[in-house]
C-alpha cells in the first residue's frame, strides 16, 4: 500500500502538481488521481517517480504496510 499523503508531500516539495507527475509516468491526470485514490501504481511508474522526484526513502512511501 502506498502512503499517498507522503507521496503528495514529495510532489509538492519538488514544486510540482499531480498532473505533472501524471505526465511523467505517461498517464492522464484522471488516471493518476485514481491510482492515488486506490494507492496502486505499477513498478515502472514507481521507478519513474522515485527517480524524477528524487525520493530518498522509497520503501517508506511505496512499500508501506497497511
Per-region residue spans from a language model:
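A short, Lys/Arg-rich alpha-helix, primarily the initiator
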Residues: 1-16, 20
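Residues in the recognition helix of alpha-helical DNA-binding motifs
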Residues: 10, 24, 35-36
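Short alpha-helical DNA-recognition segment
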Residues: 15-31
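The DNA-recognition helices of helix-turn-helix-type DNA-binding domains
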Residues: 28, 39-40, 65
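Key DNA-contacting residues within the recognition helix of helix-turn-helix
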Residues: 33-34, 62
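Short, basic-rich loop-to-helix N-cap that marks the start of a DNA-contacting helix
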Residues: 38-51
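Short C-terminal boundary/hinge segments that cap the last helix of small helical domains
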Residues: 54-66
Amino acid at each position: 500500500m502506498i502512503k499517498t499523503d507522503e507521496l503528495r508531500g514529495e510532489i509538492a516539495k519538488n514544486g510540482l502538481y499531480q498532473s505533472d507527475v501524471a505526465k511523467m509516468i505517461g498517464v492522464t491526470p484522471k488516471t493518476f488521481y485514481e491510482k492515488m485514490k486506490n494507492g496502486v501504481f505499477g513498478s515502472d511508474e514507481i521507478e519513474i517517480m522515485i527517480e524524477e522526484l528524487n525520493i530518498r526513502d522509497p520503501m517508506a512511501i511505496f512499500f508501506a504496510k497497511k
